[in-house]
Amino acid sequence: YVFNNTEHAANLFGLRELGNIYTRLMNPTTDVLEQRVAALEGGAAGLGVASGTSGVFYSIINLAQEGDEIVSANNLYGGTYTQFNDILPKFGINVKFVDPNDPQNYAAAITDKTKALFCESVSNPGLDVADLEAIAKVASDHGIPLIVDSTFSTPYLTNPIEHGASIVVHSLTKWLGGHGNGIGGVVIDSGTFDWKNGNFPLYDEPDNSYHGLRWGHDLPEPLAPVAFILRMRTVPLRNLGACISPDNSWQFLQGIETLPLRMDRHCENALAV
């Protein structure tokens, strides 16, 4: 948390360069965690948050606003289903639920108000496996991102970005952490989605909450690919505050060290059963 001079400080706050400015937004320990999970997922950037549930919520409100729609699989973790079915509508965001076993169900539910598709790579608790490539193609054909909660498969077993997902969410509390000693979540940005395609007013119009910045247009070229994560960091996270404890970030970094050993054993046990 060093400002070399006033120009350096202005550049940090103006997002002309990256650095630690305030621990709710950026923390050195959490930064290591974000980079490590992003590397495991093959993503461009990550954002640590207080829980997987807050990661899902921030992912939605970071691209959708009142009057918009999300199309989601119906076989979701109960907390996510409640968030989508009961909470988001109070913010004016409507979620349409579809049977994900036929990816064309997503296509049939998309309208000009749809801002994203959502699914879980392996559903919680039903263990249904999503056809990520097929769902991602539907999203791509309509110029919208696919958001995947990949908590149950972890990056050791599945990399949704390789199959076309734009955003990946994890509850770190479960298999990535592995030891039940912390609560947290992380959102990974693939860095490949075009937020300037005309479908996202939140990225085209000036943001009054951040000096009139247009997230899809005004970032310097090195930062433009991770506009989604930068906006999530400086709008929802900064202003709503569901930040991860740096101590929990450290605990998750220790847990990730044993992820391959634990996932191999989980798979061996499952095959035996």
Predicted regions and their residues:
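Structured loops at beta-to-helix junctions and adjacent beta-edge loops in soluble globular domains
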Residues: 1-2, 255
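Conserved N-terminal alpha-helix of the aminotransferase class I/II PLP-enzyme fold
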Residues: 3-54, 79-87
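Conserved PLP-enzyme active-site core in the AAT-like
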Residues: 45-273
